[in-house]
């Protein structure tokens, strides 16, 4: 058996372009009549003589919720006669937004792309789905969208673990960010943001990412971070000073 991979593109309008992988298990020449097994975008598909058979149905798309799985296949293609463990380690997860727009994703080949075209047409209507070669585009309106990033390892070992540091890309205010507050000296007001990575998921337990800047003449800030990726500042204003006045 040969274990292979193929890089695929995923484009989400208004959010960004991402990479993922299809993972392919191919029989060796002694078993050439056996079908290839393709994992792509959460579906496991068998391909034999250009025919597609669903081995495990997709879990990415439903009428009200989209869960995109971005797979980073860290292994190099290899051949083996032993059993292979395919291990997925979730790295970034837990966020969700309301989404209206398009998602275009690349498939392993035109046969699997046509299967996706028909499958999504049944969910969203044929007029909202289009295939161009190996690319499938779906038009979505007011659905819940989550983007999950995972590392995939193909190995004969029982466990493999990666430590990955995700960088902050977005800050989401946890209070009304356009509000104006009147605070008296000695009072305390909490302000917070949710620290998100490039996949719009919370970055948890990363105190080093927390940074708060204030005018030291205006007040003091007691900063803290919780396990949900929230950075909070408990702000205590000082008595009014000229150096703290707005320009």
UniProtKB/Swiss-Prot annotation:
Superkingdom to which the source organism belongs: Archaea
Protein name: Uncharacterized protein AF_1629
Species per Swiss-Prot/TrEMBL record: Archaeoglobus fulgidus (strain ATCC 49558 / DSM 4304 / JCM 9628 / NBRC 100126 / VC-16)
